Amino acid sequence: MVSARSKFASANFDRAKKPEGGRVAAAAVVEPSLVEAVQRAKTRLDTLDYYPEPVRVDRVRIRVAPWFFRIPGFRRYHGYAFWRTILLRSADVPDDLVTHELCHIWQGQHRALHMAWKHMTTRYRSNPYEIEARRAVAETRRPAAQPGL
């Protein structure tokens, strides 16, 4: 027997799934170009010897999720890395940002608890993992082509 409440909830759920026009807003969008950007970032990080093993990207996801960056506390960021997921504010980001965020995933693959501790106890600019990620980007950045050459 189905209660009136569950019928009402079911009807509201069905309406919520299909807004007017039949489209459902995606929580996060996957861009094929970003998957390629992760591979380019891995190639860059593989030239470094910060950790005993290279970064593993087989389970890394990258998503465009502008809604995440509207949350107070995250508004100043353009990218954010979780354990295996990189969230980006928009799809048109430089490879340096993807490399920076992938470096955080690499750090987490080797020092997850220490990373979490430092994140809670250290300011952003002086966090050793942020410093290391910025250094990784700088050390792997290609020199800009000089005009006329």
Regions found by a protein language model. Give the residues of each.
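Active-site recognition of the HExxH zinc-binding catalytic motif
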Residues: D96, H100-G108
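Short pre-active-site segment immediately N-terminal to the catalytic Zn-binding motif
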Residues: H78-V98
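Peri-catalytic and regulatory segments of divalent metal-dependent proteins
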Residues: L48-P54, Y77-R84
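A metal-dependent hydrolase signature that marks the N-terminal structural subdomain at the beginning
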Residues: M1-W67
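Post-HEXXH active-site segment of zinc metalloproteases
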Residues: I71-F74, F82, D92, Q107-R135, ...
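Long, well-structured alpha-helical subdomains associated
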Residues: P143-L149
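Pan-zinc metallopeptidase signature
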Residues: V2-S3, T140-R142
